[in-house]
């Protein structure tokens, strides 16, 4: 397959549109230049959220993670068992949570602030959302957020097996046109990738305000055996959990009269 054809297929199947919105302010540009390289994950290197050796001492002085800029275009294969064992030994018992498509970042930042002993990995392809989170990282002195500005599938390939204790996919683009539904993020392929990186007993939370998408999600889960739906009654998917902060998008959905579905699944 030619590189041109492979690129066109990747663009056709991605679950997001254009990455850049309006021109960043001077401060936002400075955050992208100075802060993003210190919190961005480098997918060209083995799984490492807490650096070791000299880099660990440097990071302790700076109060942040890797000082190297992320390679946002070239994913690496999954790390070897030896690399994974070494990094988990360095990280100790620290939990890692993953949010795919964090949008404006309100949920990601809230979880980071309320769970300081957890490392939050946020994945978002759009610059506007990344800049908002970088602003909160700088203003609130948050040290437990790591970012990937790119395709979520790249980070799901990069993460080691059974490394994530909780994952969030909140109100992803529903791609309402029938011809575009193959772009929907929650699909059997993505579920298989999530199943690989999530620990047994880990919780996966998915939110949507589109009834058709909710049905599609439940159909995808019913066709696999890696996750079980935690709902025991209607209130379990109609009522937002107390530790699920309401975002501006959810508030807009409520104002417009759209039903919000709060779906929780457990990795078995």
What are these regions (language model features)?
Residues 200-208:
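Conserved beta-strand signature within the Rossmann-like core of class I S-adenosyl-L-methionine
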Residues 53-58, 84-85:
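Glycine-biased, low-complexity coil/linker segments
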Residues 1-49, 86-98, 106-113:
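S-adenosyl-L-methionine
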Residues 186-200:
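A short glycine-rich, Lys/Arg-flanked "PGG" loop and its adjoining helix->strand segment in the class I
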């Amino acid at each position: 397959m030619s590189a041109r054809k492979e690129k066109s297929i990747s663009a056709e199947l991605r679950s997001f549109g254009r990455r850049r919105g309006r021109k960043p302010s001077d401060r936002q540009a400075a955050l992208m230049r100075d802060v993003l390289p210190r919190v961005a994950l480098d997918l060209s290197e083995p799984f490492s959220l807490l650096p070791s050796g000299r880099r660990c001492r440097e990071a302790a002085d700076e109060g942040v993670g890797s000082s190297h800029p992320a390679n946002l275009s070239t994913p690496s294969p999954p790390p070897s068992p030896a690399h994974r064992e070494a990094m988990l030994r360095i990280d100790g018992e620290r939990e890692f949570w993953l949010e795919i498509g964090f949008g404006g970042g309100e949920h990601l930042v809230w979880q980071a602030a309320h769970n300081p002993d957890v490392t939050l990995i946020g994945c978002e392809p759009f610059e506007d959302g990344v800049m908002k989170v970088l602003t909160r990282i700088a203003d609130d002195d948050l040290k437990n957020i790591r970012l990937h500005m790119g395709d979520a599938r790249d980070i799901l390939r990069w993460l080691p097996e059974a490394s994530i204790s909780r994952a969030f996919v909140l109100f992803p683009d529903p791609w309402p046109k029938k011809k575009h539904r193959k772009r929907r993020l929650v699909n059997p392929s993505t579920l298989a990738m999530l199943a690989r990186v999530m620990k047994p007993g880990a919780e996966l939370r998915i939110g949507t305000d589109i009834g058709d998408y909710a049905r599609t999600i439940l159909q995808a889960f019913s066709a696999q055996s890696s996750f079980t739906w935690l709902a025991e009654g209607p209130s379990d998917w109609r009522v937002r959990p107390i530790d699920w902060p309401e975002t501006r998008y959810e508030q807009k959905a409520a104002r417009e009269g759209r039903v919000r579905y709060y779906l929780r699944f457990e990795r078995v």
